[in-house]
């Protein structure tokens, strides 16, 4: 088995972490909005910022895996 395929597979695992993180954040945002509906605008803006940061991790993993597959 080629080592770059193994390395690319491990780099893609960052997407799993991002998915779990966004799922937990979504659950927290929904629960917070249900408890305090008047703060939904602030909760939504914080959630979008957090989801974007979490998704950046998945994008970095994807870019690294593509580089490992096609460049190295």
From Swiss-Prot:
Record SUPFAM superfamilies: F1F0 ATP synthase subunit C
Compartments, record wording: Cell membrane
Coiled-coil stretches: none
Main location: membrane
Cellular component, GO annotation: plasma membrane; proton-transporting ATP synthase complex; proton-transporting two-sector ATPase complex, proton-transporting domain
Ion transport is among the record's keywords: yes
Site, as annotated: Reversibly protonated during proton transport: 55
Pfam families: ATP-synt_C
Family matches, as HAMAP family: ATP_synth_c_bact
Protein task: F(1)F(0) ATP synthase produces ATP from ADP in the presence of a proton or sodium gradient. F-type ATPases consist of two structural domains, F(1) containing the extramembraneous catalytic core and F(0) containing the membrane proton channel, linked together by a central stalk and a peripheral stalk. During catalysis, ATP synthesis in the catalytic domain of F(1) is coupled via a rotary mechanism of the central stalk subunits to proton translocation.
Protein name: ATP synthase subunit c
Source organism per UniProt: Clostridium perfringens (strain SM101 / Type A)
The organism's taxonomic lineage, starting at the top: Bacteria, Bacillati, Bacillota, Clostridia, Eubacteriales
Gene: atpE
